[in-house]
Structures are given as structure tokens and as C-alpha cells.
UniProtKB/Swiss-Prot annotation:
Signal peptide: none annotated. Residues 130-140 have a biased composition (Basic and acidic residues). Residues 224-242 have a biased composition (Basic residues). Residues 156-166, 190-206 have a biased composition (Acidic residues). Residues 144-153 have a biased composition (Polar residues). It comes from the Eukaryota. Transmembrane segments: none annotated. It comes from Takifugu rubripes (Japanese pufferfish). Pfam families: SURF2. This is Surfeit locus protein 2. Residues 126-242 are annotated as: Disordered.
Length: 242
């Protein structure tokens, strides 16, 4: 052991499953494989998936990641991450891969930010399952006015919408009602009604001659066409007689 380089000694101290044999080789006590005293080969082996799977879970300190990663209550053989709401296998390489991932780092930074501001932390996965309006209310730090999360207009808005009027678009005299006396007596209302009928009568007088002229024009055209046909047929007969 004293003959080994300093960097190789430090590496073996950090990996108790690698031991120096009498043949001056490095042996892995997990699978019995032997390696030469080469630091690069040992680093390559320890970074591989086989070594991570062989390492017993009992020697790994899972409590160092509490309270974010705890034992699952639904699945005793697995762990549960409170920040990402995901289950993890009780294996060191699974936990290490999760805590070094982008999802966990993003959730951890958000959790620390909420702790500093004094706001309750809500995981992103839980926010995605909530309705959109509920997420907005939670982000503002208040609860929704409606219990079922649906929007409903207030009474003042309903009253304002129901009082629609056209008086602001047209003159006011168009909306004045006639008095009972004007309706019974022959006042201005009868005169307007007479004028209305007079206008219709004049329209009828103008339209009637026009219809008669059209009829005359149509009748003259048929007579003229009949005369032309009669003249042609007579001319042909005269030519045949000759």
C-alpha cells in the first residue's frame, strides 16, 4: 500500500469496495474482478453502471437528502421525492441521477425561493393538474371567490347589462308615446295616417300607367312579329305561283 502513488491511495480510501491484493492488483469485493494498479481504469470502472448496481443500498446514506427525498408510504421498497412528486428506486445511482437532474434542481431552487419569501411551495406537477384560474389565484396568494372555480358575473354587472336602451342612439321624440286623446280624436295622427295613404295612392297611380305601357309595348311587338311572318309567307306563295 505504501508503494502506491498518492492519488491512487486517496482513490482507494474513497472506495472501500476496492482493495489491494497480495499480487499488487486491485480487487473489487462486490463482483471479484481484479484490475491493475491503474487509476484511469479504476475511475472508468467506478463510473460505470455495473459498479453502481453492485453497490449495496445499505451503505448509501439516503437520509442526507431528507426532507425532500423520503421513504414512500405507498411503496415501501421505493423512495418518494416531495419536490417533483416522483417515486425513485431505493438504489444509490437512481437517487444520484435524480438529484443531479434538471427537474430536481429547478424544483429545489423554487422551493428555496418560496422559503425566503414565506410562500407555500406547490410542486409544478401538482399545479399542472389544477384549473387555470385556480393556478392564477394560488400564484397571487389568495383563494378563488367561487367555490367551484368557475367564473360568474356579479349582480352589478348583470344589472348594468340588462338595462340596454336605444335612446342614446336615436332622437328622443321617436320614443314618445301618443296620448289617449290623440289616438281617439282625429288630430295629427289622422293627418299622418292620411298622408301615408295618400303617398301609397300616388305610388299606385304612377305604377298603373307604367304597367299599361308595358302591356302595350309587349302587345305591339307580337303584332309586328305576326305581320312580318304573314308578309313573308305571302311573298313565298306569290313566288311559287309564278
Amino acid at each position: 500500500m505504501d508503494e502506491l502513488p498518492v492519488d491512487l491511495k486517496a482513490f482507494l480510501l474513497n472506495h472501500p469496495f476496492l482493495q489491494l491484493t497480495d499480487g499488487k492488483k486491485i480487487k473489487c469485493t462486490l463482483n471479484g474482478h481484479e484490475f491493475p494498479c491503474n487509476l484511469q481504469e479504476l475511475e472508468k470502472f467506478t463510473q460505470g453502471k455495473k459498479y453502481e448496481k453492485l453497490r449495496p443500498a445499505a451503505d448509501f446514506n439516503y437520509r442526507q437528502y431528507e426532507p425532500h427525498i423520503v421513504a414512500s408510504t405507498k411503496q415501501p421498497n421505493q423512495l418518494f421525492c416531495k419536490l417533483t412528486l416522483r417515486h425513485l428506486n431505493r438504489q444509490p445511482h437512481h437517487v444520484l441521477r435524480h438529484i443531479h437532474g434538471k427537474r430536481f434542481k429547478k424544483a429545489l431552487s423554487k422551493y428555496e425561493d418560496c422559503v425566503q419569501k414565506g410562500i407555500e411551495f406547490i410542486p409544478a406537477r401538482l399545479m399542472q393538474k389544477r384549473p387555470k384560474d385556480a393556478r392564477e389565484e394560488v400564484s397571487r396568494g389568495r383563494t378563488s371567490k367561487q367555490g367551484n372555480g368557475t367564473w360568474a358575473p356579479s349582480s352589478s354587472e348583470e344589472d348594468g347589462d340588462s338595462e340596454d336602451s336605444m335612446s342614446d342612439l336615436y332622437p328622443s321624440h321617436l320614443f314618445t308615446l301618443k296620448s289617449p286623446t290623440e289616438a281617439t280624436t282625429g288630430g295629427d295622427g289622422n293627418q299622418e295616417e292620411d298622408d301615408f295613404h295618400t303617398d301609397d295612392g300616388e305610388d299606385m297611380e304612377v305604377d298603373t300607367p307604367a304597367l299599361q305601357k308595358r302591356k302595350k309595348a309587349q302587345g305591339g311587338g307580337t303584332q309586328k312579329k305576326f305581320r312580318n311572318n304573314h308578309w313573308k309567307s305571302g311573298r313565298k306563295k306569290r313566288g311559287s305561283v309564278k
